[in-house]
Amino acid sequence: MSDFGINLDAICDNVKYKSSNSRTGSQVSNRSSRRMDFVDEEELSTYFNSKASVTQSDSCSNDLAVKTSIITEAVICDESEHVSADAIQEKEESIMQVDDNVMKWMMDSHDGISMNGGINFSRSKSKTGRSDFTESKSETSVSAHVSAGISSQLGMFNPIQNTVKKEAISEMFEDEDGDGCTCRNCPYREKYLKLRNKMKSVLVDMINEM
């Protein structure tokens, strides 16, 4: 058996020592007395091979049987004691798969996504033969998409997605001067018109900045 990398303090009570005159064995420094001790290789091998499992205090060994035991323990260990390398790998693969699903969902969405659940405004655009997106000149419309939750691809509930009916700005803010309008004689009509015009101006500015 070749040299060991061991924690002598953990096993010194279980392993017999040879005489210091012997040339065989691996030299280990005793930190308390600062004298050289010679560990019996046969006794040490018997100690390791007789253990049901190899713990961190046993350190590592070049012995094939001990290596096999370490590998076996790393695979079948539980969460309360040792960490399984296989478990870590499976967890990382699961996280990467979820990240891929999120990116795919975001890339496939053409209306914009609000992960916190918000309103995203977008202009109406048409696709030409040159595969370029150009703004429609005939009508500028506003669509509000309210997104709540996340995609079912992530294993959760489906997003609630309500699409507001598209209306032209001119139709949305046209004056209610018709004969059948109940607001015509309202005492608050003047304040309402000022507020409505201000809202229209803000909305147009928002659209132009997009």
From Swiss-Prot:
A GO molecular-function descriptor? RNA binding
GO terms for cellular component:
host cell cytoplasm
Q: Which residues bind Mg(2+)?
A: 86
Report the record's Gene Ontology biological process terms.
viral genome replication
Q: How is it modified after translation?
A: O-glycosylated.
Q: Which UniProt keywords apply?
A: Glycoprotein, Host cytoplasm, Magnesium, Metal-binding, Nucleotide-binding, RNA-binding
Principal place where this protein is found?
Answer: host cell
Respond yes or no to whether keyword Nucleotide-binding is given for this record. Answer: yes
User: Which family is annotated?
Assistant: Belongs to the rotavirus NSP5 family.
Give the protein name, as stated in the record. Non-structural protein 5
Q: What organism is this sequence from?
A: Rotavirus C (strain RVC/Pig/United States/Cowden/1980)
From the broadest rank down, the organism's phylogenetic lineage runs: Viruses, Riboviria, Orthornavirae, Duplornaviricota, Resentoviricetes
